[in-house]
Amino acid sequence: MSFEPSRYLNQTILAVPKSGIRKFFDVAATMPGAISLGVGEPDFVTPYHIRNAAINSLLDGETAYTSNWGLLSLREEIARYMQGRYHLTYDPGKEILVTVGASEGIDLSLRVLMNPGDEVLIPEPSYVSYAPGVVFAGGVPV
């Protein structure tokens, strides 16, 4: 009897077709002058002042978990920015949630707003994780 790991995995995840995007990226990487509009990863080194600020935060012992909503000081700054730039007022204590990236924000939004079986319009072309995210949240991509 052989061990079959997929027996123990979520069947919904196993049913989602695998994306061919990585193969595409490999081909595009061989093309001189191609501009990648892929995963949104910068093509430059993080600026020194940002790296230095991260190092200083570590040296200062700022290594504990934050609120699930994100750092209050960051949320307050986001609220100030939105007010100054767009004349929109948000309560940083109740209306702003910081995520580690757009994918996490979209995933959380889908899980909060969708009910099982809801249909969700997916624009084309779109990021490869949008449709699977809808499926994982119990919805139907349309």
Predicted regions, residues:
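Short, surface-exposed connector motifs at secondary-structure boundaries
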Residues: 7, 61, 115-117
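N-terminal small-domain helix-loop-helix segment of the aminotransferase-like
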Residues: 5, 12-101, 108
